[in-house]
């Protein structure tokens, strides 16, 4: 998957975890850069502040699903890998996680 500057990034997460959990955290990292992914909304709720990681409480995850949108706003001089890491959280501890890498370039 390739991402371009200012392009809307759309993601879908389904939690298939049988144990108890409080919510999920989505962390992102643009490798080789200090820039951030800008979160726009999740499950139809606008995000008004700039956050480096997105926590979604289980209470707002109908059917254990989250849909989100984000963007990357800077113009890269080179290609970057972008890591999306989602963790299932129970009582402030990570119980499971999954990662996805995508390519970011102009």
Predicted regions: what they are:
Residues 1-106:
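C-terminal beta-sandwich interaction modules and adjacent acidic
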């Amino acid at each position: 998957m390739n991402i371009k500057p200012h392009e809307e990034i759309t993601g879908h997460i389904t939690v298939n975890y049988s144990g108890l959990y409080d919510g999920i955290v989505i962390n992102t990292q643009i490798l080789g850069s200090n820039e951030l992914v800008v979160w726009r909304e999740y499950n139809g709720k606008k995000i008004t502040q700039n956050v480096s990681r997105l926590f979604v409480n289980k209470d707002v995850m109908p059917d254990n699903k989250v849909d989100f949108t984000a963007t990357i706003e800077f113009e890269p001089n080179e290609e970057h890998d972008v890591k999306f890491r989602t963790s299932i959280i129970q009582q402030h501890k990570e119980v499971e996680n999954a990662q996805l890498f995508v390519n970011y370039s102009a």
